[in-house]
Amino acid sequence: KDPYLRPYEEVMTGFLGAGGWSDGKLTYSTQIGGQLSKYVGEEKAMELMKQVVDNFSRFHPHPEQIILSNPTEEPEFIKPHFGLRLFPVWHIGTDYLHEIGKSWYDYLVNKGVKFIWETKVTSINFDDQKVFIEKEGSYRSYDTLIFGVGKSGIDFTSDIMEQYDLPTEEK
């Protein structure tokens, strides 16, 4: 659902997905949380992460409240008990995530992005640039397809990967 119609109980679906209900922190390191640098290199990965932070700032109602914490050493009282890895973290603010999402959504819609909600796509023909819409029983063409299914689309993603024999790798 679009961010204006998404009820609180739908924590895993809709615009922002589960991240919209997170604590509003963005880890700012390639050493944790993903494998982006493996595919684009360290420098490009950091550049892309900076773009993400910039976009959160751009759509934040109070961007001056976004802060970066960059711990350099574990506190003495923790050292004997935990082997923590310390990384820079941008604190966006939990209470602002939905406002940010709405502003971001409005921006995209005003730029001509068309969101199609609550529509089950059951197959994709990448060669002909068409998706099959289950309830319509027909294919719909697209110019650009952003495949952002989130957690609710894991099974569909697996089916597409198998159908197109896409390479996979262990995490």
Q: Where are the model-predicted features located?
A:
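Compact, glycine/acidic-enriched structural inserts
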Residues: 60-67
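Residues forming the flavin
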Residues: 1-33, 38, 67-171
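Alpha/propeptide regions of enzymes that mature by internal proteolysis
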Residues: 59-60, 76
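Conserved catalytic/binding loops enriched for acidic/polar residues
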Residues: 40, 44, 48-59
